[in-house]
Design a protein with these regions (language model features):
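Register position in tetratricopeptide repeats
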Residues: 62, 96-97, 130-131, 166, ...
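Helix-start (N-cap) detector for alpha-helical repeat units in TPR-like alpha-solenoids
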Residues: 50, 84-85, 118-119, 152-154, ...
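Alpha-helical segment of the N-proximal tetratricopeptide repeat
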Residues: 45-79, 96
Length: 267
């Protein structure tokens, strides 16, 4: 089944690892919907109705309204239990509300319905990597980026690179990240992970240069600040190290990276 453009756009937004986080679910009642989101049309055939609710659920997901996203996607799945995208995207939402067994079930069902779907393979690979099953995830990213109908293979290469890093496969990570950058030049997420490759190889000057270039274009999160702090420490730049430590403390006091700093666990 050829993936539609809207699903490719959703995957482009939400599936890049370790860098961009979704807004937490809103606490408002489920009927409190943004005024600018249209009410889905109600055509007669189930597939069109399921697609409309899936698209709407994906929009709420992008907006961080996970409660309403789940409602729309569950409705889509009930209307057409054979519409794979509804289950694939619902799996992502279920991951973000920490319903991991239910997310796994949805991804498996989506793959049973359409095992070649590049979006579902990429989504499931991402889920596996995020739940400490990175070694299993690589094959699903490969199924995604090798599929000629996939509109955003750069995302699957990026995710594969990040997951190779998680399991210490540095050469494979670099290869995947460079392939992602060839398709999506100057992508900050790919550049961040490539800086991590440089760091792990001991190329601290290259890592520092790349990180500073990325920070000049995007607002850094705790992961990037932490990697740059460790790089400056390796280079003996104590003033820059202390400045970055202050930024972590002020901006991200609850982050895992700041907790590592407090424990002086630099590696």
């Amino acid at each position: 089944m050829v993936a539609s453009k809207w699903l490719a756009r959703v995957c482009a937004v939400v599936l890049c690892l370790g860098f961009v986080s979704l807004t937490e679910a809103q606490s408002q009642p489920s009927e409190d919907r943004p005024a600018n989101v249209p009410t889905p049309p109600q055509p007669k055939d189930p597939r069109t109705r399921a697609k409309a609710h899936t698209e709407l659920g994906a929009l709420y997901f992008q907006d961080g309204n996970l409660i309403v996203a789940l409602e729309e996607l569950t409705l889509a799945a009930a209307i057409d239990p054979e519409y794979a995208p509804a289950f694939s995207i619902r799996g992502l939402v279920l991951y973000h509300v920490k319903e991991f067994p239910s997310a796994e079930k949805d991804f498996q069902h989506a793959l049973d319905l359409d095992e070649r779907s590049p979006e579902t393979n990429n989504n499931y690979g991402w889920f596996l990597c995020q739940t400490d099953r990175a070694a299993e995830s690589i094959q699903y990213f490969a199924r995604a980026y090798e599929n000629p109908v996939y509109q955003t293979p750069a995302n699957a290469y990026l995710n594969a690179g990040a997951c190779h890093l998680k399991i210490g496969e540095i050469d494979q990570a670099e290869d995947a990240l460079r392939k992602s950058l060839r398709l999506m030049p100057d992508n900050p997420q790919a550049l961040y992970h490539l800086a991590d490759v440089h760091y792990r190889r001991g190329n601290f000057d290259a890592a520092r240069k790349q990180l500073i270039e990325v920070i000049g274009r995007v607002e850094p999160g705790p992961e990037m600040l932490w990697l740059l702090l460790r790089t400056e420490r390796r280079l003996g730049n104590r003033g820059d190290e202390q400045s970055l430590a202050t930024q972590l403390r002020r901006r991200f006091p609850d982050s895992a990276e700041y907790q590592e700093l407090l424990r002086e666990n630099y590696e």
